[in-house]
Amino acid sequence: RMKVRMTYCNMETEELRYFTQEYSVRELEEWFFSLLEEYKKWADFGYEWQQIRTDSIRALVFPYAYREGQKELAGYVYRSIVRGKKLFIEAPTGVGKTLSTVFPAVKAVGEGKAERIFYLTAKTITRTVADNTFQLLRGKGLRMKTVILTAKDKICFLEEADCNPAACPFAKGHYDRINEAMYDLLLHEDHYHRETIEEYARRYQVCPFELSLDMSLFSDGIICDYNYVFDPHVYLKRFFGEGSQTQGAGGPYLFLIDEAHNLVERGREMYSAVLVKEDFLALKRMVKEYDRKLERQLEKCNTALLALKRECEGFRVIPVKEIDDLVNGVERLSETMGSWLEEHDESPVREEILE
């Protein structure tokens, strides 16, 4: 027989807890090989799907007779991908830019020049145009899986999004059912738009937003807002986080950015932040009777802001190194606040704090 130990580590206190069980070699073998079988079905599907996808792409032809300039545009796009270059396109409405960029991008995926396509847009209507373009190509024989990512507050089944399992029946037990929901979707659908995601989420009682994110891992095309790639707070860590495959020229991902000129202003918004001193004071008064540690950390942030306020009479740009006290205080506060909210999901001030 063999002893197996599982170790839990508290990230804040570094306290360790050990759980030890004893099993026979046969029990461990059965567990291990059953686990391998579960992984194998996903690996088999991935391998077989890649063959199906690649064969369909290589057989795909442009769905219409080329309009004036369309063939040249598609050629520029394909050559830019092959050479690992960036391409900026400006053309009148009605030229067929979407099809002329999506088609060569799809062809590049079929030739192994990229792993998947991200179609980024800021508007629902252009998201629909991109989706319709993939559907058009499917009608001509393309086999690619595409997903449209919808904002959590729009796709959530609750009136107000609350991911607490005690409040949301779709969050409770989500991870017990999500694999079955995903596998069913993979076997029977290629087009993961909002209605399909919601249908399967209800059928398997899982979170529709998390289901769409999980399906993105198995999708060849992802249609989404700019922020899923560029926003430092909500970007898709499964693709762009530390340790993931990197983006960029010659990398595994292609980015088709609709109305890219809008990205400048959106980028400013994504990378800008405002902290109001009075908000820290109000929050401090709110939590005073519930948690002294939180109160102290809020007071430290307030003190740091007060010191900066004195230094900034009039207008002055402060180097980042001069706000270390504030940055460190806010980081500690964020960590403590996150833990407190998890542990006090029924606190009378929880909603006010979140606001």
Question: Locations of the language-model features?
Answer:
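Nucleic-acid nuclease catalytic cores
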Residues: R1-L28
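Short glycine-/polar-rich loops that comprise or flank the Walker A/P-loop
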Residues: M2, A114-E115, L142-K145, G250-Y253, ...
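Charged, low-complexity
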Residues: R26-A59
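Conserved pre-motif I regulatory segment
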Residues: Y47-E90
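A substrate-engagement module of RecA-like helicase motors
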Residues: Q51-D55, L60, K113-I222, N227-F230, ...
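Walker A/P-loop
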Residues: V82-P104
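Signature of the SF2 helicase/ATPase Hel1-core->accessory helical subdomain module
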Residues: T101, T128, Y204-G221, Y226-S334
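Segments forming glycine/polar-rich beta-alpha architectures that bind adenosine-containing cofactors
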Residues: L354-E355
